[in-house]
């Protein structure tokens, strides 16, 4: 196996790397609460469409 084939060759079934945003595919800043599976940037842009209301 060459050097370029080593990275991401092992399947990720658990941990932070296994979960990605359903909108953009990003794995950083993921909101999993209520089954959103959405990163915080996508949540800010789509929160009103989902039904979340900002009180402050």
Swiss-Prot record:
Any one Gene Ontology molecular-function term assigned to this protein's record: zinc ion binding
Chain sites annotated for binding Zn(2+): 21, 24, 39, 42
One Pfam family of this chain: Ribosomal_S14
GO cellular component: cytosolic small ribosomal subunit
Cofactor: how bound: Binds 1 zinc ion per subunit.
InterPro entries: Ribosomal_uS14 (IPR001209), RIbosomal_uS14_euk_arc (IPR039744), Ribosomal_uS14_sf (IPR043140)
Biological classification of the source: Eukaryota, Viridiplantae, Streptophyta, Embryophyta, Tracheophyta
Disulfide bonds: none
Coiled coil: none
Cofactor(s) needed by this chain: Zn(2+)
Protein name from the UniProt record: Small ribosomal subunit protein uS14
GO biological process: cytoplasmic translation
């Amino acid at each position: 196996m060459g050097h370029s084939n080593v990275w991401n060759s092992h399947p990720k079934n658990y941990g932070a790397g296994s979960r990605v945003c359903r909108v953009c595919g990003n794995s950083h800043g993921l909101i999993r609460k209520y089954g959103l599976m959405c990163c915080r940037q996508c949540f800010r842009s789509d929160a009103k469409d989902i039904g979340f209301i900002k009180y402050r």
